[in-house]
Amino acid sequence: MKRQKRDRLARALSRGYHAGILGRPRENCPYHSLDARSYWLGGWRQAKEDRV
């Protein structure tokens, strides 16, 4: 069970990173659960830093 949860969160992180690299706004986050949303936003923020 923990492995599946971790995989889901890792996927949210990588999708957020990809969205940030493409320059999409953070309001486009597709996740509604707090955990997945925070991972997506973390990836998005990291991508924004990497683009600079």
From Swiss-Prot:
Signal peptide per UniProt: none
UniProt keyword terms in alphabetical order: Cytoplasm, Translation regulation
Localization per record: Cytoplasm
Biological process terms in GO annotation: regulation of translation
Main localization (coarse): cytoplasm
Pfam families for this protein: RMF
GO-annotated cellular components: cytoplasm
InterPro entries listed in its UniProt record: Ribosome_modulation_factor, RMF_sf
Protein family (similarity comment): Belongs to the ribosome modulation factor family.
Role according to the record: During stationary phase, converts 70S ribosomes to an inactive dimeric form (100S ribosomes).
Protein name, UniProt field: Ribosome modulation factor
Taxonomic placement: Bacteria, Pseudomonadati, Pseudomonadota, Gammaproteobacteria, Enterobacterales
Gene (UniProt): rmf
